[in-house]
Amino acid sequence: MRLAQRYGIALVALLMVGATVLFFWSENIINYENIKFNSPVELVWWSRDMSWNYDVQRQCGIHTCRITNKRSRRPWARGVLFYGSNIKTGDFPLPRNEHQIWALLHEESPRNTPFVSNKEFLRHFHFTSTFSRYSNLPLTTMYLPSGEALTSKDYYVTFDGKSKYGYRPSTSVVFLQSDCDTMSGREDYVKELMKHLPIDSYGSCLRNRDLPESLQKDYLNNLYSPELLRFLSEYKFMIAIENAACPDYITEKFWRPLIMGVIPIYFGSPTIKDWEPNNKSAIFVNDFQNPQALVEYLNKLADNKKLYNSYRQHKLNRRNPISNKKLLHNLVTRQYHIGDSSPGASLFEKFECAVCYHVINTARNVKADLRHYNCPLEPVYAKMEGQKIPQNVADWRAAMEVGQCQAKVLDEFFRRDIGFNDAEFDAELNRRIEGNNCSNSSNT
């Protein structure tokens, strides 16, 4: 009996000890989870161009995020953020931390950072925000303020109203560009058009007219100013040639004339017809064999009211102004567009919150591929007379080939996972170029 009693007491004591251990263990787990839940997710901007102190705490939905440019916080950061135009080839956070992702924001064409549009570079990123519909935070229609901007008649001028300006040719074509010498050979093509057609050219490229004095001061930073839109809306056609011909790379050059009720003469994104408001909203340079053939069609269109207005159904069809379901769906679901002044609506804030959400809810092994920023290695340009090529196409081809080699060098350094500087990067790049060791294989 005494033995049984002692055994029972020992058992009770053992159970109490076990319960105590279990209690403190569970408390530790709960406290750990609370710390993990309550601590903000940290993200670090990796850009020496951000010379100012940036350290903010932002509420991204249900998640609290801390975003900073203090590099000393990298060991605790869940993500490192890069802005494409500011990336320096000798400045990357290596060795990488296993718990971190790399995130890339780049809405521009590859002219400034040609290495970005290569699979060898892209595959080291877990999150992207680019013009491509396939990126994690697509910016394909970012330059279209709203669907209402397309259908509104705020700047609309009737066909007869456009035709009353007797001092202009009936074709009434405008060209407004100050970014010259582009990968797409924009000025070369416009020069060809000018041989067959009078074109009013404003801006720094091929200028033959001056903007009104009130618009000359800072029009590049006011591309959608009401005064500028009213001035341009008097024209029938506007030349809209992108800097580069990348899938889904669509800028204000396409949307602005549509907003004004002016027909765009477009060259650029090969996927542009996926995004036009209706099946016939723009004139596409690629549909014509050469500039002269395009001019012949413009002359026909400019004198035919019914045919001209058939391109402006987004303004004239009240029942169904926009028939493109893909575009309509994008306008409802997209996360960013210009002109949104609400709190937290800037491009960088949207990107930061999207990355914050991503690191919490998505597996780290998901990585970017070539579709996330797909620009061709070989510069693409419009067909010109007599199979001419743009004046500087060879220079752009060489720049893109160097960019491809840069991507391969970066890929090698990233795989080694050891820090490197500009001098080491340049030495390896020069070694490859001098040894003809940069493959020109297909970028697929």
Curated annotation (Swiss-Prot):
It comes from the Eukaryota. It is a single-pass type II membrane protein. The chain crosses the membrane at residues 7-27. Glycans are attached at residues 279, 437, 440. Its main location: Golgi. Pathway: Protein modification; protein glycosylation. Residues 28-444 are lumenal. It is found in: Golgi apparatus, Golgi stack membrane. Pfam families: Glyco_tran_10_N (PF17039), Glyco_transf_10 (PF00852). Residues 1-6 are cytoplasmic. One of its GO terms (cellular component) is Golgi membrane. Its EC number is 2.4.1.-. GO terms for biological process: fucosylation; protein glycosylation. GO terms for molecular function: alpha-(1->3)-fucosyltransferase activity. Keywords: Glycoprotein, Glycosyltransferase, Golgi apparatus, Membrane, Signal-anchor, Transferase, Transmembrane, Transmembrane helix. The keyword Glycoprotein applies. Belongs to the glycosyltransferase 10 family. This is Alpha-(1,3)-fucosyltransferase B. It comes from Drosophila melanogaster.
